[in-house]
């Protein structure tokens, strides 16, 4: 049986890590695309030479031509300008919007049947623009955000309780930014909700609120530490989880930036919600019942996303025609 083909648009830190993880998980052959001559080719060769050591079979190719992504089963878009210290994800909007238009056109021409995962920031607006530019079905284009945000929250909670990360579950909704909505009612340790752990004295409300704040600032914390560039290991691993669920039809329930069609009371936006990812792409959205406070936070987050989408529409009006 022929191996799946995974195309990575952007061969930077995230793209290179994605290629490595795809190889290690034996998800398929990999094409690295980047406009910087030599970078995708060099990384592809390095990864190919790693495969005998790591013990996997996969073909790696580097290119600066979109035609080389032809027939890709999965396309993961990471291309764009990363954040620098002091910048928010929103500061990247105008320049990365142009990248999404170019990537969308390339995907539409050469990989129209692919499942597309957007990683580029500001995420919720960029995945919206990428779907508009590509014209692909909305359920075949998603954004990577909630998996990463929830993973950060899981790690912080595991550290707080001094337990294995494997026993911690977490759920983060809303936009991939300062207004994201961590839902503590749905965060558990071995099935025990965090609010119950507060009641039995394992932690305090103040400490949990500090963890929520740290989760919202998780990306910025890494940007400040690195000084140049942004997180790449965890974002790549998060996108690979989504790709694997699609390629293997695992039907995992993952928090992703998914297209809303009335769920949660919103339409025509990509917002972070739990969704089933399988061979048909976004197969179902899980619509949680939110209490009054959660609903207010979620609506604030959606309003932030809407503002970014409106800004995209003003910069590139052809996307909404």
From Swiss-Prot:
Binding site for substrate: 83, 89, 121, 152
Primary enzyme class: oxidoreductase
GO-annotated biological processes: lactate metabolic process; tricarboxylic acid cycle
Residues at the active site: 176 (proton acceptor)
Positions in coiled-coil regions: none
Entry superkingdom: Bacteria
GO molecular function: L-lactate dehydrogenase activity; L-malate dehydrogenase (NAD+) activity
UniProt function note: Catalyzes the reversible oxidation of malate to oxaloacetate.
HAMAP family assigned: Malate_dehydrog_3
UniProt name for this protein: Malate dehydrogenase
Originating species: Azorhizobium caulinodans (strain ATCC 43989 / DSM 5975 / JCM 20966 / LMG 6465 / NBRC 14845 / NCIMB 13405 / ORS 571)
């Amino acid at each position: 049986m022929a191996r799946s083909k995974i195309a990575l648009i952007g061969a930077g830190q995230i793209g290179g890590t994605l290629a490595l993880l795809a190889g290690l998980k034996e998800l398929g052959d990999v094409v690295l695309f980047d406009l910087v001559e030599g970078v995708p080719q060099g990384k592809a060769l390095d990864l190919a030479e790693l495969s005998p050591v790591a013990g996997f079979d996969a073909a790696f190719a580097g290119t600066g031509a979109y035609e080389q992504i032809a027939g890709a089963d999965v396309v993961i878009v990471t291309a764009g300008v990363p954040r620098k210290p002091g910048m928010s994800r929103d500061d990247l909007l105008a320049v990365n919007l142009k990248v999404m238009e170019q990537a969308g056109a390339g995907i539409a021409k050469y990989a129209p049947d692919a499942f597309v995962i957007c990683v580029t920031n500001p995420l919720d607006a960029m995945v919206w623009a990428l779907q508009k530019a590509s014209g692909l079905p909305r359920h075949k284009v998603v954004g990577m955000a909630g998996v990463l945000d929830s993973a950060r929250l899981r790690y912080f909670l595991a550290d707080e309780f001094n337990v294995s990360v494997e026993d911690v579950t977490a759920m983060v909704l809303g936009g991939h930014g300062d207004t994201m909505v961590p839902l503590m009612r749905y965060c558990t340790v071995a099935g025990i909700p965090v609010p119950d752990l507060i009641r039995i004295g394992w932690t305090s409300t103040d400490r949990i609120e500090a963890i929520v704040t740290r989760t919202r600032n998780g990306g910025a914390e890494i940007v400040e530490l690195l000084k140049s560039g942004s997180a790449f290991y965890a974002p790549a691993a998060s996108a690979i989880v989504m790709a694997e669920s699609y390629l293997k039809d695992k039907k995992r329930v993952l928090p992703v930036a998914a297209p809303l069609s009335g769920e949660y009371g919103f339409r025509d936006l990509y917002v972070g919600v739990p969704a089933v990812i399988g061979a048909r792409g976004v197969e179902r959205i899980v619509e949680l019942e939110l209490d009054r406070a959660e609903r207010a936070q979620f609506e604030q987050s959606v309003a932030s996303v809407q503002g970014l989408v409106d800004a995209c529409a003003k910069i590139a009006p052809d996307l909404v025609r």
